[in-house]
Amino acid sequence: MGGGDLNLKKSFHPALRRNQQAVWDEEQKALAERKRTQQRLDEIKEERAKEEVQRQLEAAGGKKKVDRVEWMYQGPNDGQTGTTEETEAYLLGKRRIDNLIKGTEHKKLEKDAGTESFMALQNANTARDTAAKIREDPLLAIKRQEQAAYEAMMNDPARRRQLLASRGIDEDKKDKSRRKEDRHRRRHRHRSADGEDRHHRRRRSYSRSQSPRRRDGSREDRHRRRRDDSRDRHSRRRRDGSDEEGRRDRDNRSGGDRHRHDGDRRHSDEPRDERRDNRRDERPRDNNRQYSRRSYPSDRRPRHNEEDDKAKEEERQRKLAAMQSAATELDVDRQERLADLEKREQAAREADNKARERGGDRGFVNKLHQQAEHKGLAERMGGARRGYQKDDD
């Protein structure tokens, strides 16, 4: 049994061929590197010798040489005429640089890349194209579908109530706060209207008291006063919105008109001194009338309570109607689901009956096969033995 030298089986043994090949390759690389280094040293020596000769010539009175990096301006990348791709193509030997040096290809590129082509591309984005792009935008279509679904859900009172409940918002409290704000706004509006009307009446009474007292019994003054009283009565009746208050106001106004007409007649018949006395007697009556007018808006407060009760009742009726509609919708959905389930069960029963009718002819044979599959070995041997006995008989 000769196994040879066991050292040759080691991977690091120097007698192996692959190890010798690796050593030889490394030696060749070192020699090539030494040759390149020596060549570069020789080139440096030659350049130094040339520089020394040039320096000696310049010192002897020769022409001076200007040191410039001309190698940066040489090659295919001549200013704006070249690109990185062209430089790589030139280095790989796939492209000639004659045309780049001459400049003909650069001019051709300038013609092709003019402003006309750029503007032609810009003209494609017209208003119609932009509208079509916006209309066919899938994200915009998705947003529209989401908005439509949200609006449908908010229009449904039951689902809207569920959504608000999930967010922790009480719709009843929200409605109460809204009604309170509306009530406060109405009260503020009525108070401002009453203040303006009171100020207007005060200014009119003051202007009447400051005006001269001549021609009180004339027909034009009576007509003017009657027209002013009717305008005030109409505005107050429209603001109050009550037939009872309007009727009371008309009675008061008619009584005042009768007193005024009687006083006018008395003024026209009586002497001037008696007329002055009657005017003094009538002043407290006018003051009482103005006081009654000022105290009139205080009777309107119960009417606001009635309006609030009416608004609450309407809101309650609206909520009740919404609850009833939601319950009706739930009942309709439940009935539809039950009807659909019943239809499915009926279709399944019909399919089962058809399958039974189709397999009724082969039912007996299938039953025999099933019985044969479930028989044991003893039963089969016993049946075969009985068959043999019958044959012997």
From Swiss-Prot:
Coarse class of the primary localization is: nucleus
Against Pfam families, the record matches this protein to: Cir_N, CWC25
Q: Where is this region: Disordered?
A: 38-61, 151-393
Q: Does the keyword Cell division apply?
A: no
> Where is the protein situated, by its record's location annotation?
Nucleus
Q: Which UniProt keywords apply?
A: Coiled coil, mRNA processing, mRNA splicing, Nucleus, Spliceosome
**Sequence ranges of Basic and acidic residues compositional bias:** 38-55, 168-180, 213-232, 240-288, 296-318, 331-361
Q: Which InterPro entries match?
A: CIR_N_dom, CWC25, CWC25_splicing_factor
Q: Name one GO biological process term.
A: mRNA splicing, via spliceosome
Task: Report the function annotation for this chain.
Answer: Involved in pre-mRNA splicing.
Q: Under what name is this protein listed?
A: Pre-mRNA-splicing factor CWC25
